[in-house]
Amino acid sequence: MTEKNAYAQSGVDVEAGYEVVERIKKHVARTERAGVMGALGGFGGMFDLSKTGVKEPVLISGTDGVGTKLMLAIKYDKHDTIGQDCVAMCVNDIIAAGAEPLYFLDYIATGKNEPAKLEQVVAGVAEGCVQAGAALIGGETAEMPGMYGEDDYDLAGFAVGIAEKSQIIDGSKVSEGDVLLGLASSGIHSNGYSLVRRVFADYEGEAILPELEGKALKEVLLEPTRIYVKAVLPLVKENLVNGIAHITGGGFIENVPRMFSEELAAEIWEEKVPVLPIFKALETYGEIKHDEMFEIFNMGIGMMLAVKAENVARVKELLDEPVYEIGRIIKKEDKSVIIK
């Protein structure tokens, strides 16, 4: 028995791994940007920070996955957008600190290496990188028979960005009276899916629920997470934003306080929040308490900005999209987030 045959008999297909690398090269090439050094396949991805032109550079990093949304991608055999979700979860976190994404690395583990499927996943990662302006400079695809079922895989990513030291957003600039501006989400994004899957467990993916405005359930559930980098970065560059909250796991209640100091609180005006149909459906079909919805989901606002009142007009001008004035920063008396 040759070593190659022995490895194949253990469930690892080396040739399929080589095929994946060849398939993804064209997708990786789409993401190239100034600063990238070396070619795909090296032991480490390289990036030349001097190409960024940042005078006092601070590197800001983030890592994340897509949770059990991945189980729906597998269930519905739709793998071309889940990679964008992974990128979004990472780069939206670092833009909240004022960072411009520079590069991204992905990690895929699977029970059986299926090149066509994994190409779709990486194509989605590349699309997310293009939207974020980040280079896909490396990654790992691990075939792990026995650890995962043949049809299963897991996906995680790691993003690194850069900011001028003077433009870091860390909550210290937010003050009483700042206006809270909300940017629309594209849907559920990539958190809360253990609950989402339970609520819709008895519905087919093709189901058309009246609340979802004619869209198939699986289309709504797998809607890619919006990437906010290109919308928000110009605001950071002009020093127009005091605080940013990426509304992910924990909803408004957990994430909004992360952008200001402990003596402050956020007053949210619920009637100003553009609640998406999917959240109304989740609340109804899942019999979820209304208040709890704001503790789990983004409710239609995927990113929140704290902005001085005199800067609101300029922020709206630069964003060139619907911007929702959904609250203000107040002195904290009890709770960190008050939804009125």
Curated annotation (Swiss-Prot):
Catalytic reaction equation(s): 2-formamido-N(1)-(5-O-phospho-beta-D-ribosyl)acetamidine + ATP = 5-amino-1-(5-phospho-beta-D-ribosyl)imidazole + ADP + phosphate + H(+)
Entry keyword Cell cycle: no
Give the UniProt keywords, A-Z: ATP-binding, Cytoplasm, Ligase, Nucleotide-binding, Purine biosynthesis
Q: Which GO terms describe its molecular function?
A: ATP binding; phosphoribosylamine-glycine ligase activity; phosphoribosylformylglycinamidine cyclo-ligase activity
The metabolic or biological pathway listed in the UniProt record of this protein is: Purine metabolism; IMP biosynthesis via de novo pathway; 5-amino-1-(5-phospho-D-ribosyl)imidazole from N(2)-formyl-N(1)-(5-phospho-D-ribosyl)glycinamide: step 2/2
Instruction: Name the GO terms of the biological process aspect.
Output: 'de novo' IMP biosynthetic process; adenine biosynthetic process
Q: What is its main location?
A: cytoplasm
User: Family assignment?
Assistant: Belongs to the AIR synthase family.
PANTHER family according to UniProt: TRIFUNCTIONAL PURINE BIOSYNTHETIC PROTEIN ADENOSINE-3, TRIFUNCTIONAL PURINE BIOSYNTHETIC PROTEIN ADENOSINE-3-RELATED
Protein's recorded name: Phosphoribosylformylglycinamidine cyclo-ligase
Q: Which organism is it from?
A: Streptococcus uberis (strain ATCC BAA-854 / 0140J)
Lineage, top ranks: Bacteria, Bacillati, Bacillota, Bacilli, Lactobacillales
